[in-house]
C-alpha cells in the first residue's frame, strides 16, 4: 500500500483530512504536526478581544485524524530527502512516503532586528497563540510591531479589550503606512479607525533595536514596553532551502499550478509555505489556502491514479475582512472598502462556518 505523508495541518490539510472521512482511498495516510491542536488564525483577533474562547478557534487533530483513518504524529519536519522519499523529524524519526504534501504556513519576518529575537513574542507557529495572548492581556505597556493585516487586527482587538478594562491603549509601530499593500482608500480608512480608537500609532519608522524595556526606532523614538508582540509579515520556512528543494527568491517552495513541485511531482504544497511559479505575487493569506484545498485533494487522487491533475486558477480579487474591535470590521474587496458592524457579522459567520466543518470534539 502506498504512503501519503501530510506535513502540517493548515487550511488545505484540514480539508484533506475531512475528505478522507467521506471518501476512502487505498493508501496509508500519516499527518505530522507540532501540536495536538490546529489554531485558526482568522479568529485570533476575536480571541484576543475576548469574543471567542480557545475552543472556538482550534481543531483537535488526533480526533479528526482518527475519524479519517489517519495516523497522527506529534512532531515537526526537519528536512526532506526528495530523491530518497523520506522526511527527517526534529525528534530524529525517519518517515518514508510515496506522496508528500506540505502545508506548514510561514514564519515571522524581521526578527533579526537586534534584540527582537530574545525579547519579542511571536504567534507563529500558531499553537503559541494562547500563551502569547495571556502575556499581552496582562501587559501594562503592550506594543505591537507590524502594520499589515495581522498586526492591525491584533492591536485593535487588544485596544478594544483594554478599553473595557480601563487600561492604557496599545502602541502599534509600522515601518510604512498601515495596510501598505492595499488601496490608498483602505490605508487611509484603517488609520482613521485606529486613531478614532485612541491607538498610539508610530508610522513610517523602522525598529532599529529592542532592549529589555524599550523599542528604539530608526527616528530615535524610545517606546517603553513590558510585552512586545512581533507581527511583521511572513517569512519562508528554512527547511526547503536546507533540503535543496526548488524555491523562489524568498525561500518558499516553488510549485506549479497543480500544486506540485516540477522536479519532484510526488511533492505537493499549499498555503503560505509555497509560491506558485505562474502567480508569484499571490498573497500569503488563508483565503488562498482554502481555495487551493479542493485542487490539492483532486490532484492527490489524480497522482495515485496516474491521471492528469486539475489546475489552480487564482481569483482576480479576494474578500478580506479585518476585525477592528467592538464587533466592527473593515471589508476589502477589489475597490470596495466598507467599515461596519455588518462586515464583522459576515466575518464571524464565515469563520464559525469554517470551524464547524472540522470540529469533532469539545476539546
Language-model region placement:
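Internal hydrophobic alpha-helix adjacent to the cofactor/substrate pocket in enzyme cavities
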Residues: 287-315
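C-terminal auxiliary extensions adjacent to catalytic cores
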Residues: 326-363
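FAD-binding core/adjacent interface of flavoenzyme oxidoreductases
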Residues: 1-5, 67-141, 229
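FAD-site-proximal beta/loop scaffold in flavoenzymes
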Residues: 118-138, 222-227, 231-291, 298-299
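A Rossmann-like FAD-binding core segment of flavoenzymes
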Residues: 26, 72, 78-79, 95, ...
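Beta1-alpha1 glycine-rich phosphate/pyrophosphate-binding loop at the start
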Residues: 1-70, 153-182
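FAD-binding beta-loop-beta segment adjacent to the flavin cofactor pocket
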Residues: 251-268, 313, 327-336, 343
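Residue-level detector of alpha-helix initiation sites
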Residues: 11, 127, 149-150
Amino acid at each position: 500500500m502506498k504512503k501519503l505523508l501530510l506535513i502540517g495541518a493548515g487550511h488545505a490539510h484540514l480539508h484533506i483530512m475531512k475528505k478522507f472521512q467521506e471518501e476512502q482511498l487505498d493508501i496509508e495516510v500519516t499527518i505530522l504536526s507540532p501540536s495536538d491542536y490546529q489554531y485558526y488564525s482568522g479568529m485570533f483577533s476575536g480571541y484576543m478581544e475576548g469574543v471567542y474562547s480557545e475552543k472556538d478557534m482550534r481543531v483537535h487533530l488526533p480526533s479528526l485524524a482518527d475519524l479519517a483513518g489517519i495516523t497522527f504524529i506529534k512532531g515537526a519536519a526537519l528536512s526532506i530527502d526528495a530523491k530518497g522519499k523520506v522526511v527527517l523529524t526534529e525528534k530524529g524519526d525517519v518517515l518514508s512516503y510515496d506522496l508528500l504534501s506540505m502545508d506548514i504556513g510561514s514564519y515571522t519576518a524581521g526578527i533579526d532586528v537586534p534584540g527582537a529575537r530574545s525579547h519579542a513574542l511571536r504567534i507563529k507557529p500558531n499553537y503559541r497563540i494562547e500563551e502569547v495572548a495571556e502575556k499581552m492581556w496582562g501587559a501594562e505597556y503592550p506594543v505591537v510591531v507590524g502594520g499589515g493585516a495581522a498586526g492591525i487586527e491584533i492591536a485593535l482587538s487588544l485596544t478594544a479589550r483594554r478599553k473595557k478594562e480601563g487600561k492604557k491603549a496599545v502602541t502599534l509601530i509600522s515601518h510604512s503606512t498601515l495596510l501598505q499593500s492595499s488601496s490608498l482608500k483602505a490605508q487611509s480608512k484603517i488609520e482613521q479607525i485606529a486613531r478614532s480608537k485612541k491607538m498610539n500609532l508610530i508610522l513610517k519608522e523602522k525598529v532599529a533595536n529592542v532592549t529589555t524595556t524599550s523599542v528604539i526606532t530608526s527616528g530615535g523614538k524610545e517606546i517603553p514596553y513590558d510585552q512586545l508582540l512581533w507581527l511583521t509579515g511572513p517569512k519562508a520556512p528554512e527547511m526547503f532551502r536546507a533540503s535543496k528543494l526548488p524555491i523562489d527568491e524568498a525561500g518558499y517552495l516553488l510549485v506549479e499550478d497543480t500544486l506540485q513541485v516540477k522536479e519532484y511531482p510526488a511533492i505537493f504544497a499549499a498555503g503560505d509555505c509555497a509560491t506558485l511559479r505562474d502567480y508569484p505575487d499571490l498573497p500569503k493569506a488563508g483565503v488562498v489556502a482554502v481555495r487551493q484545498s479542493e485542487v490539492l485533494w483532486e490532484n492527490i487522487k489524480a497522482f495515485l491514479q496516474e491521471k492528469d491533475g486539475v489546475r489552480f486558477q487564482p481569483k482576480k480579487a479576494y474578500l478580506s475582512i479585518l476585525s477592528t474591535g467592538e464587533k466592527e470590521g473593515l471589508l476589502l474587496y477589489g475597490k470596495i472598502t466598507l467599515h461596519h458592524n455588518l462586515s464583522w457579522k459576515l466575518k464571524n459567520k464565515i469563520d464559525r462556518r469554517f470551524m464547524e466543518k472540522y470540529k469533532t470534539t469539545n476539546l
